[in-house]
Amino acid sequence: MIKNTAKNKNGIITRATIDLKKDLKFVKLTAVSNLAVQNGEMLAAVTEKLLVHYSEGTGERHQEMSLPLNGPDHVAYIHLSRTGFHAIVSSKLGHNFYIHLKSNAFHHLKKLRCVVTAVGWNPDYSKETDTTGPILLGTAQGSIIELNVGSTGMMTTLKELTSQVAQIAEQRITSAPSPAAAITDIQLFQLADDDPKNKKWMVIIAQMARLIVLITDNEPAPVVKLGGFTSSASLQAGLMNLATEQAPSTTFHSFFTSPNTLQHTISSSKFSEKFKNHGFLTMHPTIAEPKRYAWLSPDGISIGNVNIYAERIQDVLVEEFNIEHRLIEGRLEPPTGIALTDYHVLLAYSSRVLALSLLPPHDVIFEDPWNPELGGALGFVSDNVAEFVWLYTQTFAMKYGTNDEARYIWKTYLDRGEYQKALQIARTRVAIEPDALEMVLRKQADFYIQEKNFTAAAEILAQSSEPFESVVLKFLTNSSERKMGLKTLLDKKLERLTRHEDKIRRDALVMWLLNVQLEELAEMRRLKNSNPDPAFVEKLRDTTDHVQRYFMRKNVIESIQTNRDAVYRMCVAHADFEMQLFFANAVKDLRTVIDILMLREQYFEVLEVLKNQRISELTYEMCPLLIEHIPKQVIVYLIQNQDQISPQKLTPCLSLCVKNMEMAIPAIKYLEAQFKGTQTISQNPQNLANLHNIYIHLMAKFRREKLLGYLESHGTIRSDLPYELDFAMRTCEQFKIEPCVVYLFCVAGMFGDAVEKALGFDVDLAKKCALMMEEAEANFAWLEGMEDPAATSYIRQKLDEKAKKAIWLKIGQYYVTQENNVDKCIELINESNHLLTIQDLLPIIPKFTRVGALKPIIVDFLKRNKQRLEKLERSMKEATEIASEIRDKQEKLKNRTTVVKPSDVCSHCARPISGRAFNVHSCRHFFHRECLEIAMISFLSQEEVEKMKTLIIDEERVLSQMKAEQLAGNQKGFIEKQEKYLKIAAFISNIVGAECPLCGNIAISQIDKQFLSDEEFAADLNTWLL
């Protein structure tokens, strides 16, 4: 390996020199005549007929292939596919070979007799290893041939598409081949592959003095007639027998046969037969869609842009600049080869390589002269996949590559003011050179600020990492342009804050940006008052719409939701209720929406908001406020949603409807509609008491003539009333609706007050009230049977006969005193169902009333009294007989005795009763005295137990004293002690012998008590545990 002597100041271009004989072990090397490298696969002609295949990537030993060539023939051209799978080798005398580099097998293409100077590889078969696919061959005579050959060397397609491509360029055809006619390069592109049957293709064909661009669509291959005319060029190319065989189908024939083919030619203006170098065409990049081309022609080196998808074919290749050839000692010195990188063009001369910048002024940034012992340059080939360029001499190869060639390009663009290009490069170098991006951004922003384009400057600075405070200072003025820039800056900064950790900063930017927008809108509204121009009004509307759309973005609306109280305060500070209403709607803050609409007295809009939402507490809260302004609409809304609305919660709303007729009538309609829902009412009538009270109030004030019918429809049973009786009575008294007051008195059981009130205006109503006492009597029996005493607490004491008579007598007194009509007074006896008697009426009848009028009444009274007296006499007689019978039984009981048999046993201990003191009960249960005390102890109170224990002690003490007196012979003392002993025994008998402990009242009263206490039960339960 020879030491690198390249003069490269900045190290952008690198070179590695390889001695093919020593380093790659090409032992049979005499002189390299041709070399090609693609995708790391090298194929070199090391002698006139010996080829060497070397895989750079694998490092395996090279393979040698000897072609069947006879002198003076030798290898002239080697064409490698981009993948390095296929090779076409052409000799000086027109012999051609296909080499499959995977197997290192070569095949002689005997039917192809011409010098192949260029190959256009098919991009559709870029990954195919078994076949080349349809490809285009360019010859030294200027003809184009389509070939398809497989890995076995079998040609499925071989057809000459045109004998002279110069015909397309309308150039003069010469019979003899010349350097100008030879095809130097073919670039094949597929433009559309959506429809595999109708693909669009482009081919760029290069000759020494011209470039030809053709675009066509696929068409079916033409039918070739057998035995046709064969051109002289074809004869020279050895293709004379192709027309006599069945012509295979071709793919690219339409380039040269279709009338729809588009073509464009670029020609050199300084063509000279003395220009002996072949023209070279190279493009970059070659793997993807090419963007730039370089063409070596007699005019110089043309460098320009490539756009294979251009609308006009003339715009496919557009020259950017041309580098003229240098004259040395009066003759041209064209390069041996050219190659393109991203930002440089490499020119290979016989003893040096130059790298020129593609940017003006196209300075030489790299020069690499090499030692003469390396030999002169024979060729300059590019490895399109590996992006290396190979220069070769007879025994050496030099491998050129790039090393971060964009490191100074961005500065060049920046100095020239091409900020977008500089920015594009700087972004790709952020990891390598982060300061580059910052410098470009600042320079571009400063340029925009100088141009007063603050919006563009803000967009640029938002991408910069310059401290936010220093950036903002550039826009903090009262200038409208700078304010627009500030808005843009805040907006762009906000777009970049997408992480969860940036929430605080995002909220701050949203609030700041909102404040700026509100200030702008406030200023525009102020100017609108002094400028009623419709265009300005439309501008204000558009600005408002723009602001609203902007703040509806997801990250912005989330911040507004979080800080909505601060947003509301900001809107209020700018008096912008429109925006506040917009934000409230955006975050679904219904309360604020309604508050703003109520403040603006937009009551119908408030109702619409409630209609669009589910029934909630807000509905019940707003109805009292709305019903004062739009009562009809509110009531219609309530009726339409009565299934979802709780009527009890509407009490405050309906209570307000007593103010005027306009509100009352809709409220009455709603309540009537609600009362018709019998199912709802029957579930819990008491819950609707307030609604019925409101209804009574409304009816009493605005529909008093219908109130009595409503009250009567609910009956007189107080427990069934849906309204509060006391409230109804007060309301009717307040509005002086006397028939309703009388009716309610009757419902309340205040018949005396009802009759007294009714006598003031209607005596018939008074009698009707008196008759209602009988209905109350029937209902009272039902009410007395209720289990809950509290439920009957409102019922007055049952009226006795005397009270009823007093009420009827008030009516009779009215007839006598007010109407002076004794006959009607006497008729009350029948009307009261004979509750009144003539005796009751006599005190109020005037003294001088004729007896004749009273005679039928008196006779009837005596008849009824006679029966009653006879019944009373019979009852007294029966009572006397029963009393006598009871007295006789009592006398007999005084002499009753009980006989005790010797076989009778104690009911407690089951032992014979005789032998010890015992007690006998009338139920024939016998107990020893001690057993009775034990049996009765559980029925006695603590006080009685203590008393009995004391008496037993006294009894034992007196008994011992009595025995002592007896032994002493003191008869008198013995009698005294005996009497005392009997008294104590009598006291004990009264305590324990009052009732039988087994069947007496005391035992019956203890029947619901447990046999065992909780402690006893637990103790007994433990005895059963194993």
Curated annotation (Swiss-Prot):
<keyword id="KW-0813">Transport</keyword>
<dbReference type="Pfam" id="PF05131">
    <property type="entry name" value="Pep3_Vps18"/>
</dbReference>
<protein>
    <recommendedName>
        <fullName>Vacuolar protein sorting-associated protein 18 homolog</fullName>
    </recommendedName>
</protein>
<dbReference type="GO" id="GO:0005737">
    <property type="term" value="C:cytoplasm"/>
</dbReference>
<dbReference type="InterPro" id="IPR007810">
    <property type="entry name" value="Pep3_Vps18"/>
</dbReference>
<comment type="subunit">
    <text>Probable core component of at least two putative endosomal tethering complexes, the homotypic fusion and vacuole protein sorting (HOPS) complex and the class C core vacuole/endosome tethering (CORVET) complex. Their common core is composed of the class C Vps proteins vps-11, vps-16 and vps-18, which in HOPS further associates with vps-33.1, vps-39 and vps-41 and in CORVET with vps-8 and vps-33.2.</text>
</comment>
<keyword id="KW-0472">Membrane</keyword>
<feature type="zinc finger region" description="RING-type; degenerate">
    <location>
        <begin position="906"/>
        <end position="932"/>
    </location>
</feature>
<dbReference type="GO" id="GO:0005776">
    <property type="term" value="C:autophagosome"/>
</dbReference>
<comment type="function">
    <text>Plays a role in vesicle-mediated protein trafficking to lysosomal compartments including the endocytic membrane transport and autophagic pathways. Believed to act as a core component of the putative HOPS and CORVET endosomal tethering complexes which are proposed to be involved in the rab-5-to-rab-7 endosome conversion probably implicating sand-1, and via binding SNAREs and SNARE complexes to mediate tethering and docking events during SNARE-mediated membrane fusion.</text>
</comment>
<keyword id="KW-0863">Zinc-finger</keyword>
<dbReference type="GO" id="GO:0031901">
    <property type="term" value="C:early endosome membrane"/>
</dbReference>
<keyword id="KW-0967">Endosome</keyword>
<keyword id="KW-0458">Lysosome</keyword>
<dbReference type="GO" id="GO:0048284">
    <property type="term" value="P:organelle fusion"/>
</dbReference>
<dbReference type="GO" id="GO:0006904">
    <property type="term" value="P:vesicle docking involved in exocytosis"/>
</dbReference>
<dbReference type="GO" id="GO:0006914">
    <property type="term" value="P:autophagy"/>
</dbReference>
<dbReference type="GO" id="GO:0008333">
    <property type="term" value="P:endosome to lysosome transport"/>
</dbReference>
<dbReference type="GO" id="GO:0099022">
    <property type="term" value="P:vesicle tethering"/>
</dbReference>
<feature type="coiled-coil region">
    <location>
        <begin position="858"/>
        <end position="896"/>
    </location>
</feature>
<dbReference type="GO" id="GO:0032889">
    <property type="term" value="P:regulation of vacuole fusion, non-autophagic"/>
</dbReference>
<dbReference type="GO" id="GO:0008270">
    <property type="term" value="F:zinc ion binding"/>
</dbReference>
<dbReference type="GO" id="GO:0030136">
    <property type="term" value="C:clathrin-coated vesicle"/>
</dbReference>
<keyword id="KW-0479">Metal-binding</keyword>
<dbReference type="GO" id="GO:0090389">
    <property type="term" value="P:phagosome-lysosome fusion involved in apoptotic cell clearance"/>
</dbReference>
<dbReference type="GO" id="GO:0030674">
    <property type="term" value="F:protein-macromolecule adaptor activity"/>
</dbReference>
<dbReference type="GO" id="GO:0031902">
    <property type="term" value="C:late endosome membrane"/>
</dbReference>
<keyword id="KW-0963">Cytoplasm</keyword>
<keyword id="KW-0072">Autophagy</keyword>
<keyword id="KW-0862">Zinc</keyword>
<keyword id="KW-0968">Cytoplasmic vesicle</keyword>
<dbReference type="GO" id="GO:0005765">
    <property type="term" value="C:lysosomal membrane"/>
</dbReference>
<dbReference type="GO" id="GO:0007032">
    <property type="term" value="P:endosome organization"/>
</dbReference>
<dbReference type="GO" id="GO:0033263">
    <property type="term" value="C:CORVET complex"/>
</dbReference>
<dbReference type="GO" id="GO:0005768">
    <property type="term" value="C:endosome"/>
</dbReference>
<dbReference type="GO" id="GO:0042144">
    <property type="term" value="P:vacuole fusion, non-autophagic"/>
</dbReference>
<dbReference type="GO" id="GO:0007040">
    <property type="term" value="P:lysosome organization"/>
</dbReference>
<dbReference type="GO" id="GO:0030897">
    <property type="term" value="C:HOPS complex"/>
</dbReference>
<keyword id="KW-0175">Coiled coil</keyword>
